[in-house]
Regions:
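A well-structured
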Residues: 1-291, 297-302, 390-404
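Active-site-adjacent bridging/hinge elements
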Residues: 120-122, 224-230, 271-276, 334-347, ...
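Short flexible/disordered coil segments
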Residues: 136, 143, 276-291, 329-347, ...
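Structured ligand/cofactor/substrate-binding pocket environments in proteins
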Residues: 141, 145, 196-199, 308, ...
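Active-site-adjacent "gating/activation" loops or surface patches in catalytic cores
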Residues: 165-180, 289, 293-370
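Short helix/strand-bridging catalytic loops that position acidic/His residues to coordinate divalent metals
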Residues: 228-235, 352, 378-381
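Inter-helical turn/loop segments and adjacent helix faces that build the functional surface
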Residues: 238-239, 262, 266, 307-310, ...
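Zinc-dependent metallohydrolase catalytic domains
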Residues: 323-333, 340-342, 368-405
Length: 405
């Protein structure tokens, strides 16, 4: 047996070869909805079968999203993603709600092992409380609209010293010891973004209105409160976040102000500009711990392998199975994410890597998240958690890509 071959989980309920069309999916949902359940054991089997269906859909959607973000300029990949978003998900949503209700209303629910199923039950009840039929077309539109951002930003590039760079690649010049080089890079990046200012502002306003309507339809005052519920944030509230923000303002901001003053003095500048914030104050050139994506992957595997041989082996297998895309290039979506693949039992890692130290931290963050996916691949009750965690990962990637420059 080749340890580098990652085998997908064997299906026991669905066909081993399954084309995602509504004609193929509809009978499966119908059988799950109509199946008679006469005991806790049968309820668990129903959950396993439903989880298998969820895993099939999640991984199919995952690969459509991954391929699209790897090449935002490929219209066929965009159409493939949009087919799922517009033709499959809107039909699946009400049936998922029906299956959620069947699960929660089962007389055998209380007989399940609560230590194993409590989180799944809690999340399913939350999904039932949030579901609104009128939100299905809105969420479909949101799915399609928000991908326009990646297409627009993925196409951005600048020319520095006669060579074309993606914005992430150009950001490496912000660490250059020559101030004019840094200034030119920062202004070039900013000016390129400003070209799309009106387009991106219009897109933001469109999405804001759609998301606010989704929240109001679900009886929330705003989208923030709706997403706290949708992401399953049961352990802290928006008020907790506000208190944390205030604590940062009182304790961290003054420290950062002192650091900025020290930086200004060390660089012997009358005032700090945005292009002065990343250069080494000692005058040393920027760290360049890897020359390309292949070396970044190899060094990361070696590092993690020394921490935990099993994790190193799994990352080596992920590399062999093409589960990394770490190079920055034109047409690649900005930001980074770790996308769990429900049937494969391993994630796809898509960091916004640059040939500098930040690239190492991006990949390290992603692989620490990947460790969770690797170790939880056999969890039969993990579907709801996978969905919420993936959504948080992708939204975090979008936020980071917007805030980086």
């Amino acid at each position: 047996m080749n340890d580098l071959v990652i085998k997908k989980k064997e299906r026991t309920y669905l066909k081993s070869v399954f084309e995602i069309t509504w004609e193929n999916l509809s009978p499966i949902f119908d059988e799950l909805a109509k199946r008679s359940i006469g005991s806790a054991t049968e309820l668990e089997q129903w959950l396993r079968d439903r989880s298998e269906l969820d895993a099939l859909l999640e991984e199919d959607f995952a690969w459509r999203y991954i391929r699209m973000t790897c090449n935002t300029a490929d219209e066929a990949l965009l159409n493939s993603f949009q087919y799922f978003a517009t033709e499959i998900e809107p039909k699946v949503a009400p049936l998922n709600d029906q299956l959620n209700r069947k699960f929660i209303e089962s007389p055998f629910l209380t007989e399940l092992d609560q230590s194993k199923y409590a989180i799944l039950i809690r999340g399913t009840k939350q999904a039932l409380a949030l579901f609104r039929e009128e939100n299905i077309p809105l969420q479909t539109t949101i799915q399609v609209e928000q991908q326009k951002y990646q297409g627009i930003t993925g196409a951005m590039s600048v020319t520095l010293n006669g060579q074309e760079y993606t914005l992430e690649q150009a950001a490496t010049f912000l660490k250059d010891t020559n101030r004019e080089t840094r200034k030119n890079a920062w202004q070039s990046i900013s000016n390129r973004r400003l070209v799309e200012k009106d387009t991106l502002n219009d897109l933001f306003n469109t999405l804001r209105a759609l998301r606010h309507q989704v929240a109001q339809n679900a009886n929330f005052d705003n989208f923030r409160d709706y997403m706290f519920a949708a992401l399953g944030r049961f352990d802290y509230t928006a008020e907790d976040c506000f208190q944390f923000h205030e604590a940062i303002e009182k304790t961290v901001v003054p420290v950062l102000a002192k650091h900025a003053d020290a930086r200004k003095k060390a660089l012997a500048l009358p005032s700090l500009q945005p292009w002065d914030m990343e250069v080494d104050t000692s005058g040393k050139p920027a760290l360049k711990p890897f020359k390309d994506g292949a070396e970044l992957i190899e060094k990361s595997i070696t590092c993690f392998g020394k921490l935990d041989p099993f994790l190193g082996e799994r990352l080596q297998a992920m590399k062999a199975n093409g589960l990394f895309d770490v190079e920055s290039r034109k047409g690649k979506a900005p930001g980074g994410y770790n996308y769990p693949l429900a049937e494969t039992g391993a994630p796809f890692i898509f960091p916004g890597s640059k040939e500098q130290y930040n690239g190492v931290t991006d990949v390290t963050d992603a692989r620490l998240l990947a460790r969770h996916a690797v170790w939880s691949e056999k969890d039969p009750a993990g579907t709801g958690r996978r969905r919420a965690e993936t959504l948080q990962s992708l939204q975090g990637a979008e936020r980071r890509s917007r805030c980086e420059f």
